[in-house]
Curated annotation (Swiss-Prot):
Protein's UniProt name: Protein YecM
Family (UniProt): To H.influenzae HI_1582/HI_1581.
Gene Ontology cellular component annotations, sorted alphabetically: cytosol
Membrane spanning stretches: none
Gene name as annotated: yecM
Species this chain originates from: Escherichia coli (strain K12)
InterPro entries: DUF991_YecM-like, Glyas_Bleomycin-R_OHBP_Dase
Amino acid sequence: MANWQSIDELQDIASDLPRFIHALDELSRRLGLNITPLTADHISLRCHQNATAERWRRGFEQCGELLSENMINGRPICLFKLHEPVQVAHWQFSIVELPWPGEKRYPHEGWEHIEIVLPGDPETLNARALALLSDEGLSLPGISVKTSSPKGEHERLPNPTLAVTDGKTTIKFHPWSIEEIVASEQSA
């Protein structure tokens, strides 16, 4: 299998990776978030058109395997397990989340967020995630925090999300890894 960066259909996101790495580093710094000890299990894209999502899907099918395809919040989301990971900071992401466009318009097509796993009680996720962020960082202009509980059609585990964004790049926190969530769907 080919490396994802060598696939024609993925050249735009291969070129976008340095921008995302810089933006993620900058957001982490602004938030006072030390990412070094944290486990992030996947990286996600955003696009504006179904044609882009279909093209990226064709590309990922050439360099990985479809792990899951599910309807979440009214739109398809595919998870791909790549044979060669996406390198961001000290993380090696073998799982890529590819959502189709939804109602929300994102300012950029390309890499948009990472998801950090904070194992523990889902009820305490928000407090545990916020404790990692500086009060000063959270009060900066343009920084926003959102909580949600996205749920796949067959998902069995409660999977709350705390997302922190500057409007361009987002860091999300979950109590479960994406592979644990997929396993819960498959046992449904």
